[in-house]
Regions:
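Hydrophobic/aromatic packing residues within the alpha-helices of TPR/SEL1-like helical repeat arrays
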Residues: 33, 40, 53, 74, ...
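Alpha-helical segment of the N-proximal tetratricopeptide repeat
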Residues: 5-42, 134-140, 145, 181-186, ...
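Alpha-helical repeat scaffolds
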Residues: 70, 126, 133, 275, ...
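TPR-adjacent "capping" and linker segments in tetratricopeptide-repeat scaffold/adaptor proteins
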Residues: 1-12, 23-24, 117-126, 167-173, ...
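TPR-repeat structural position
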Residues: 26, 46, 67, 96, ...
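Residue-level recognition of tetratricopeptide repeat
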Residues: 18, 38, 51, 58, ...
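Structural motif corresponding to the intra-repeat A-B loop/turn of tetratricopeptide repeats
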Residues: 23, 43, 63-64, 113, ...
């Protein structure tokens, strides 16, 4: 192998690198990662090069614990991603999923490097890019894509504390969510309308705070989730029924409609025990695990934490999934935010939900974990959560 390595392309070098790393030969593996990254760069495969430079930087940071060791590789990755962003936004049809990934990687790197100046600079630039995209989609009456773009613009303006801009975007989102909700109601899509009302409530909170405007809209979301559950039940879809009911439970909880939330939660728990048993009897353990997580969410919503953690632990024994971990942390944070009327926690919940909606579960998990750690009132439930996950402090 040593005699032919110079003839190998970056793909082969990358495969060999990870083989070395998996064998415990970290130093040799990282040298090959660097060579593979340079090879991809020479072939103008910027995305692959950026990915490997980022990986190299994070491994060096983890092993050495020194930012300076990781800085060259991470900066190389960041600027390659910036090149990719510039290329993407000049295309006739922008791939917003690819753009999301590139922008997230750049900001993650500058956040890791504690480079506040570049973090704010590029967050501001990305916000403007997404705002322009949102306007373009809106002009073409593509409301779902306009919403996606404006949501990203809102998040990036929040990073820069540009109050005027993020309030402006929030106002635009209120209009678009309202339009989306109306369209879905006209089509008889209760769940789609409920999701739009839920997100509309979040934008209202950005302007008015945790007040009656937010509460009324969140209550409307709850009613539509409840209506969607009845439609699903009439169609014999019990899985969709309970999914909508758990969403209704938490919408009512955030709307401070505690009695309705509790009643739905208790009834949903009963249904879920039967559904889980049915999935298990058919040998569908994966679906049973998903419903066990839903059961845990419903139990957290009615403050039955010990039972919730037992259900969650059972789910993880069947299937360990990052999305499960995010869902449980969100349930804990929502329950706490509702019980305390804590707008700061709700702000963090919305950030976590944003990244979860992008399927960036690592970032969502990190944000949710940080929020849990900050609150001493959550120490007991946090310890129970870690125990269920097999993490001992």
């Amino acid at each position: 192998m040593a005699t032919t390595i110079g003839l190998e392309g970056p793909e082969e070098l990358e495969q060999l690198a990870f083989k070395k790393i998996n064998e415990g030969k970290i130093k040799d593996g990282l040298k090959l990662i660097l060579r593979a990254a340079r090879g991809y760069e020479e072939e103008r495969k910027k995305e692959d090069a950026a990915r490997l430079y980022k990986y190299l930087g994070f491994v060096l940071l983890e092993k050495a614990g020194l930012i300076e060791k990781a800085r060259p590789s991470l900066l190389k990755s960041a600027y390659l991603y910036i090149d990719l962003i510039e290329e993407e936004i000049t295309r006739l049809e922008v791939d917003i999923d690819a753009l999301d990934g590139y922008c997230s990687n750049v900001l993650e790197i500058f956040l890791t490097l504690k480079d506040e100046r570049n973090l704010r600079k590029y967050a501001e630039e990305f916000a403007a890019i997404y705002e322009d995209l949102g306007k373009s989609y809106q002009d073409n009456d593509d409301i779902p894509m306009a919403i996606r773009a404006y949501e990203s613009a809102y998040r990036y303006y929040k990073i820069t504390d540009n109050i005027e801009s993020y309030r402006r975007i929030a106002e635009t989102l209120i209009t678009l969510y309202g339009q989306a909700a109306e369209e879905r109601l006209e089509k008889g899509d209760s769940r789609g309308a409920a999701e739009a009302f839920y997100r509309l409530a979040s934008s209202i909170r950005a302007i008015f705070g945790y007040d009656i405007h937010f509460i009324e809209m969140m209550d409307t979301a709850g009613k539509n989730f409840e209506k969607a559950s009845k439609v699903a039940y009439s169609n014999g879809d019990l899985d969709e029924t309970t999914t909508c009911l758990v969403k209704a439970q938490y919408a009512y909880l955030l709307a401070k409609n505690y009695n309705r939330s509790k009643l739905i939660g208790i009834n949903t728990v009963r249904m879920l025990y039967q559904i889980i048993s049915s999935h298990r009897s058919r040998g569908d353990d994966e679906k049973a695990a998903e419903k066990l997580v839903e059961l845990a969410e419903a139990l957290i919503g009615v403050s039955k934490i010990e039972e919730a953690m037992q259900a969650y632990k059972s789910a993880l024994e069947t299937k360990s999934d990052l999305s499960f971990r995010v869902k449980i942390r969100l349930a804990i944070l929502k329950q706490f935010a509702a019980s305390k009327g804590d707008e700061d926690i709700l702000e963090e919940v919305e950030k976590v939900e944003y990244y979860a909606s992008k399927k960036n579960y690592m970032r969502a998990l990190e944000l949710a974990g940080n929020t849990l750690q900050k609150r001493p009132e959550l120490e007991e439930i946090r310890n129970m959560l870690y125990e269920a996950e097999g993490i001992y402090q």
